[in-house]
């Protein structure tokens, strides 16, 4: 009867308060520079040590510049936050992957690629996109700063048990359709609140066909549907990805781990609180047109009209389109764009750079387009160079920047100017997310690449 979520959650319950929260043991805490300073300050004020320092990994990513990382950070706020994390990690005896450390990168890219995120774990971080790690078959979710302090002090957290939802995507994915498109399609149908209160398990033939990188992308976007987290049962794809990585089990321990991981799946008779089904054949390359990730459509489609909308929905819809400079019923194909961003914890992995390179190879970047290609980690950067993707990208007029969160959010130097259109592989298109007045169009690396070389919104299938 147990779901995958139930198995992992129940294995980590320390105690349950009647009609209250569960005390849940946490296997891994990730800390970055933005949401951790007050947590460490709280420990200092109480004279508390970190309970299990070996379970905590720290790295800056949000504020790190994507150029000249060997020089002091110019922005004083960013410098303070990055320096504070360095000091806190040193003071409390925590593992810290600082800027220019070849293990550094975006926390949700580094965790899986370093073998720090493993099936069956409970994982938290003061960051909403912690759901990414669920792709490995873990229960992973974002927490607030006061909860970060709680985990640092006790290695436990108080949480109410969420409901469970299974989203099944049956059938085979079409040409040019990626995990990013699956996620944007789901949100366009379910809205950004469609999974609120649920922990989602993704299943079905289309999900199983995804690479590990694709699964990480899909689970990353779970939070944008309102879900507490997302997860995929581990299988041979997962095991092959983990095997031999820096912190992965070795030798006999590996064999024992895989034996256990194979039990981490929902039973055939498992009951979910809600079941949702989609057909892979209905999904095409997607793009957003509004100011939340649920305002997406197939790239060949038209922006919806206001027909049938109530006044409240209509007002919100039109306000969003006004910000974007679009009209109801308008097509986006052929629309001129200004910026392209490849990166973020959503699409900053090696597979994403391979996809982007496959489209731009033999072409040239459109002259007016400014493109920021930002690896999610130094490991991804090294892979790009090992595979010769840097040569393909540079020949096409693109430069590769240094790792970091970059233009996903306006917390560093990489900001989109007001009124400019950015085709972005990141996860949020809220007003001002990429910079005050910036207009963000969320898409896959394939769609971003097509826009980068044509200078307009284009269907990547025509370039494949």
Swiss-Prot record:
Its EC number is 4.2.1.33. [4Fe-4S] cluster binds at residues 345, 405, 408. The keyword Ion transport does not apply. Signal peptide: none annotated. Binds 1 [4Fe-4S] cluster per subunit. One of its GO terms (biological process) is L-leucine biosynthetic process. The keyword Ribonucleoprotein does not apply. Its cofactor is [4Fe-4S] cluster. It catalyses: (2R,3S)-3-isopropylmalate = (2S)-2-isopropylmalate. It holds the Pfam family Aconitase. Pathway: Amino-acid biosynthesis; L-leucine biosynthesis; L-leucine from 3-methyl-2-oxobutanoate: step 2/4. One of its GO terms (molecular function) is 3-isopropylmalate dehydratase activity. Keywords: 4Fe-4S, Amino-acid biosynthesis, Branched-chain amino acid biosynthesis, Iron, Iron-sulfur, Leucine biosynthesis, Lyase, Metal-binding. PROSITE patterns: ACONITASE_2. Heterodimer of LeuC and LeuD. Belongs to the aconitase/IPM isomerase family. LeuC type 1 subfamily. Catalyzes the isomerization between 2-isopropylmalate and 3-isopropylmalate, via the formation of 2-isopropylmaleate. This is 3-isopropylmalate dehydratase large subunit.
